[in-house]
Amino acid sequence: MTNIIQQLEAEQAAKIEAKRTLPEFSPGDTLRVNVRVTEGNRTRVQAYEGVCIARSGGGLSESFTVRKISYGEGVERVFPIYSPLVEGVEIVRRGKVRRAKLYYLRDRRGKAARIVENTGTRARKLNESERQAAAEEKARLEAEKVAAAQALAAEKAAAEAAEAKAAEEAAKAAEATAE
């Protein structure tokens, strides 16, 4: 009875992760976050690319902050990890930093705000595993498309065969009435 909230949060997190999984990322990484945006009655997916400057919270309320420079102005956006509006996250490059919160980047401009790319073995492994997972997902989607196209072609062929059979029967009936 004591951990009912934790149990409910774990169930909700598992339910959301069944639909989509986010890659393992940390502050300093340059991310491309695909966000679902609703404008009037239209919905589209918009990419928001910037540097992850913080991850905070835990459980269902965990979130991450992404900072980018747009037309010379710094723009920060906080995304909840388990938000249904976050379609997916792609890691553009991994950064090498010594802090968990990179709020000092707010005061820096241009080259001073650069983050060194992490080329260590762990970063390489993570990048390779992400690429492999993306390739597997792409192959799975392609296989689904091919299967759907084949099913559609088979359905079309069956419909044409039934139509030809009906036309043949109609011709026989017309021939029988003509005699």
Curated annotation (Swiss-Prot):
GO terms for biological process: translation. Keywords: Ribonucleoprotein, Ribosomal protein. GO terms for molecular function: structural constituent of ribosome. It holds the Pfam family Ribosomal_L19. InterPro entries: Ribosomal_bL19 (IPR001857), Ribosomal_bL19_CS (IPR018257), Ribosomal_bL19_sf (IPR038657), Translation_prot_SH3-like_sf (IPR008991). One of its GO terms (cellular component) is cytosolic large ribosomal subunit. PROSITE patterns: RIBOSOMAL_L19. This protein is located at the 30S-50S ribosomal subunit interface and may play a role in the structure and function of the aminoacyl-tRNA binding site. This is Large ribosomal subunit protein bL19. It comes from Agrobacterium fabrum (strain C58 / ATCC 33970) (Agrobacterium tumefaciens (strain C58)).
